[in-house]
Curated annotation (Swiss-Prot):
The lineage of its organism: Bacteria, Bacillati, Bacillota, Bacilli, Bacillales. This is Phosphonates import ATP-binding protein PhnC. PROSITE patterns: ABC_TRANSPORTER_1, ABC_TRANSPORTER_2, PHNC. It comes from the Bacteria. Part of the ABC transporter complex PhnCDE involved in phosphonates import. Responsible for energy coupling to the transport system. Pfam families: ABC_tran. Residues 2-246 form the ABC transporter domain. It is a peripheral membrane protein. The gene is phnC. The complex is composed of two ATP-binding proteins (PhnC), two transmembrane proteins (PhnE) and a solute-binding protein (PhnD). GO terms for cellular component: plasma membrane.
């Protein structure tokens, strides 16, 4: 379980990114967070593995405080958290296989991984992960030779090879076309269902949130304004999340284009 206890984040310029967040996400959930740009979605997501440090409060993972963790303990906790970014975050000039093997770095010494010395078991796991997202044939291609959708699937394979217990996906389909968007979200959903990996995804599209989530969390101005099951996420609730009905309608139109 991931638990946020009275979590707040204030940026150096005084902007409040999160305001007293109290939230529990159970193991194996597929949670989609929605809200306008600047609502706090990315800040909340990235605070889980401390890419963004919180100002107040505490974040617990399986009963252990990642907020207080340091050194080896922090590295161990981060090893269980896979991160997927809108920008793919791959080493473009490296092969797909090497990018996936990057998910194994946390399990070995710096010297071994720097020299590319991974055991046979890691290679097998990397190949299995690529096969899982239907991109095995690209194992020896350079990452920058792949389409955006293919690169995002490499990111998912990397999280699988990492054997992550939690996957955080920050706007993973924002730059993708509708068909590729479906493929990427289908992959994330199937992995969540097959392996019980807790998955938290930030999305702008209301339509996609309804299609894939088991639970939707709506943020507005750094606060949670909705937290419920998909069937509870009515148009009226989305209007509250996005501020007004006009904004909500505009986003619905974008979602179905």
């Amino acid at each position: 379980m991931i638990e946020f206890r009275n979590v707040s984040k204030v940026y150096p310029n005084g902007t409040k990114g999160l305001n007293n967040i109290n939230l529990k996400i159970q193991k194996g959930e597929f949670v989609v967070m929605v809200g306008l740009s600047g609502a706090g979605k990315s800040t909340l997501l990235r605070s889980v593995n401390r890419l963004h440090e919180i100002t107040e409060g505490e974040i617990m993972i399986e009963g252990e405080s990642i907020t207080a963790a340091k050194g080896k303990r922090l590295r161990r906790m981060r090893r269980d958290i896979g991160m997927i970014f809108q920008s793919f975050n791959l080493v473009k000039r490296s092969t797909v296989l090497k990018n996936v093997l990057a998910g194994r770095v946390g399990y070995h010494s710096t010297l071994r991984t720097t020299l590319g010395l991974f055991p046979k078991e890691d290679l097998e796991l990397a190949f299995q992960s690529l096969k899982r997202v239907n991109i095995l044939e690209k194992a020896y291609a350079r990452a920058d030779e792949l389409s955006g959708g293919q690169q995002q699937r490499v990111s998912i394979a990397r999280a699988l090879a990492q054997e992550a217990k939690i996957i955080l996906a920050d706007e993973p389909v924002a730059s993708l076309d509708p068909l590729t968007t479906k493929q990427v979200l289908d992959d994330l959903k199937k992995i969540n269902e097959d392996f019980g990996i807790t998955t938290i995804v930030n999305l702008h599209s209301i339509d996609l949130a309804r299609q894939y989530a088991t639970r939707i969390i709506g943020l507005h101005a750094g606060e949670i304004v909705f937290d419920g099951l998909v069937e509870e996420a009515t148009d009226e609730k989305f209007a509250e999340i996005y501020g007004d009905v006009a904004q909500k309608s505009e986003l619905l139109e974008v979602a179905v284009k």
